[in-house]
Amino acid sequence: IVIHTDPAPTCGVFLGYYLNKDATDSVWHDGMYHTGDVAWRDEDGYYWYVGRADDVIKSSGYRIGPFEIESTIMELPYVLECGVSAAPDEVRGQVVKASIVLVPGVEGTEELKKEIQNYVKTHTAPYKYPRIVVFRKDLPKTISGKIMRNKL
């Protein structure tokens, strides 16, 4: 997502990083602010948020947003929390890895992993399914409650 701010700054858009000219220069180009967010516009003109550009998983030439995969997995009644990240892969470059916290009383089994993978295959593009599924007790989070993908 890029915001045009020239000739005058747009209300609500920051003017730069405090005492960090290099970081400011990396997001401002010719009066345009590059947010680092990725979205797409449908035929009706609505914008759909995909995620952060630095979170995008690049697998076999495809660009996969973790937010879509997380949202799909969260539809399952036995999933309490989910975080999706990239895992290195020799053939594909990266693959989708899903770290999942199950509701109390549900056990993470190989059969459940396959069920989750098949669910994602049938509710998104088949290449987006998590090739790695890990069950965890909890997910690492920032102080504001956001999942720390780099720790998954």
Language-model-derived ranges and their functions:
Residues 133-136:
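General small-molecule cofactor/ligand-binding pocket signal
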Residues 18:
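Adenylate-forming
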Residues 1:
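Glycine-rich active-site loop/lid that clamps phosphate-bearing ligands
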Residues 4-10, 15, 23, 38-128, ...:
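AMP-binding/adenylate-forming catalytic core of the ANL superfamily
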